Every structure is written in C-alpha cells, then in structure tokens.
Amino acid sequence: MTPSPSNHDPVRAIKSAALHPRTTRNWISQFKLAQGTLIPWLASRGVSCAGASVAEIGCAEGGVLMACVEAGASYALGTDIQGQLLREVTTNCASIAGYSVDLTEHDVIYEDIPDHWQGRFDLVMLRDVIEHLDDTSIALRNIKRLLKPGGVLLLTFPPYTSPYGGHQQLLDTRIAKLPFIHMLPRAIFQKFINKTTTVNKEEVERLAVIRLSADRVRTAAVEEGYAILDQRYFALRPVFRWKYNRPWIPTLEITSLSRLRIVRALAMEAAFLLRVPS
C-alpha cells in the first residue's frame, strides 16, 4: 500500500457520506487520534508505519487502522468480534475513505491464531479493548504470536479505578453518568445497573469482575516476555477533543507522576508500547 495522493481528504469524504452520525463521529475521532497522537508517539520511539504490516484488534469503524495506511503501512488487518459491524460499517468506511484493508471477525482469546497471521506484523494495536477481555495474560500471549521479532504492541485502556473505568456512562440512568459511581460497594452499584434496560448492562457487569489495572497489565506483559518500550498516563485523554468535537479540551498527561500508584490507578488512560524480543 502507498500513501494516498496529496489531494486525498478522507475526513471530508466520511463527513460527506450518508453515514449514521455515530459512525461519522467515531471514525473521524479514531483517524485524528491516530494522526495526532498515536503515530507521532510511535515515531518518537523509532516505530514507523511506513512499509509496516499493521493489525488492529477490536478495530471497530477502523479509523485508527486506516490512518496507519495513510501513513504508509504496506498491509493492514482489522479484527473485531462484531462481524456485523465489520461487514456493514467498517467495510463501507474503508470504501468511502479510499483505503484497502483486510477485515475479519475474530476473537483473540477464544479462537486460534491463523497460521498466515503468525509472525507477520510489525505493529499490533489494541486500543480500549483489553479491559473487556477475560484474561489479560492469554490476550498478550496470543498477540505476541502475531508479531515479528522486534515487533511492537500499542495498547491503551482506561483502568477500572479511573473516573469512568466502569463504563458506567453507557447505562441509561442519569446517576450512572457520575464519575467513580462504579467504585461504590458492588451491591449498591448493582442496584443502579439493575435499573437500566441498556444492551450494555451485561458488559458493565463483566468489567466490574475484570477490574483491570495498569499494574496488572505491566506485570502480565513482563511475564509474557514483552519489554516495556514506553508507558504514558493521562488525566484527560487525547481522544476527548475529537470524540466530543471540542478542540479546546486539552490533553493532560501525568506520566511524570506515575511512580505514584494512586496516579496509575486514577489515570483516565494508561498507554503502553510493548516490544517482543528481536
């Protein structure tokens, strides 16, 4: 794959298409997050998308993955457990934006890694996905099989103990929108969950069991043979300005304070670059 012509404007193409407003918002926020934050971060650590084979697990609308193609990725694979989303939304977005990507329904924990994926990728991305997975260690172990020697995993997620780490904002009650309400005693929080009818109810309950932390990810990564190339922590996430279409929202990084456990626990985003041995 080669970068798009200089007059190519994928964001304008997506905005102009007859897409659901949520699809438009999500794709653009993903694309701009990758261009404005993720790809520059990778470059600062010597990881380039140019000529690279890239995979994104849990790619959703595919904006991040397609930004990697725009940056020169030679091959791009997007997977998600929601096959209907890939078929009806992501494929359409790729066509409208003018990118060639492979899209496949796949579960990184419960399904085998196809032979032709193993050892193929220079970069794998797992953005806001790992907190939903039942076993962090198995996920990291399986992803390691995708990577070439010296390959890098980019991983971001909101720790459970962060203000909205319980994803309680997905529930359809006003009180559930409050920060830290998921940190109430489980029996009390469960009462709020039980009052909702949202399809996200079961996922909020699952997250309350998983309760993923940055420290658990760090420990699992080292145990699975990764080296921590870099780690960052944010009190205000880089994606907010694009996700909510509020350019004035700052990105507030608190990595300089991350030696303190409470900072790692309360950060709204933990982000890691993990490298497998060469």
Predicted regions and their residues:
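A short beta-strand submotif of the Rossmann-like class I SAM-dependent methyltransferase core
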Residues: 126-129
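Conserved N-terminal segment of class I S-adenosyl-L-methionine
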Residues: 1-119, 123, 140, 236, ...
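Active-site micro-motifs of SAM-dependent methyltransferase domains
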Residues: 108-110, 131, 162
